[in-house]
Regions:
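S-adenosyl-L-methionine-dependent methyltransferase catalytic core, i.e., the SAM/SAH-binding region
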Residues: 1-170
C-alpha cells in the first residue's frame, strides 16, 4: 500500500504488510548495526531507525528508490546509508562501508508493489505498457519483451520451469 504522509513535507511511503511483526522480531537496539537488504521505499528502514538510535545500511538495485533514500538521509543523518546493489552482494557492499558484523537483517524478497504499480516498469498486466521487467533499467539491457519475442521455445520453457517454478513447462 502506497500512501502520502504529510509531516511538514510530503513523504511518499510504502507500508510493509508485516511491519509490526518484523520490528518485534528484530527488536532494534541502540548502538547496533542493521541492514535492510531490500530497501524499496524504506518502510522497514524507517521503522528500525525510529525505534532505536542505531546505524542502518540499506541495499537496493533499483535507482528509483533514491528519492526515498534521500528523505531518509535527511531525517536520519549519520544513521542511514543507501548502498546501490543486489542483496546477493551484501558482503562486498558492507566491506566497502568497513562493516564486518551486523546485529540484524531485513530481507523482503520479491517484486515490490511500487514496481508493479508503475506501469512503465513492465511488471504488471494491468496497463498497456511494454513488457520490460528489469529491476534496474539503467544497468540491464535485455527486456522481458526481448526474451519473449526472440528466445526459442526450449529456452522459454527452461526459464518458466527454473524461474517460474512450473514443473510442467514444455
Amino acid at each position: 500500500m502506497t500512501k502520502e504522509i504529510n509531516n511538514g513535507n510530503q513523504f511518499e511511503y510504502h507500508f510493509p504488510v508485516m511491519l509490526k511483526e518484523v520490528i518485534d522480531a528484530l527488536d532494534p537496539r541502540d548502538n547496533e548495526v542493521y541492514v535492510d537488504a531490500t530497501f524499496g521505499a524504506g518502510g522497514y528502514s524507517k521503522a528500525i531507525v525510529e525505534k532505536a538510535n542505531c546505524k542502518l545500511f540499506a541495499i537496493d538495485r533499483d535507482p528509483s528508490v533514491k528519492k526515498f533514500a534521500d528523505k531518509m538521509e535527511n531525517l536520519f543523518p549519520d544513521r542511514f546509508t543507501l548502498m546501490m546493489g543486489r542483496f546477493s552482494e551484501i558482503k562486498e557492499l558492507l566491506m566497502e562501508q568497513k562493516i564486518s558484523q551486523i546485529d540484524g537483517l531485513v530481507l523482503d524478497i520479491g517484486v515490490s508493489s511500487m514496481q508493479i504499480d508503475e506501469g512503465q516498469r513492465g511488471f504488471s498486466f494491468d496497463s498497456e505498457e511494454l513488457l520490460d521487467m528489469r529491476m534496474n533499467q539503467n544497468e540491464q539491457n535485455i527486456t522481458a519483451k526481448d526474451i519473449v519475442n526472440n528466445y526459442d521455445f526450449e529456452s522459454l520453457c527452461q526459464i518458466i520451469k527454473n524461474f517460474g517454478e512450473e514443473p510442467k513447462a514444455k
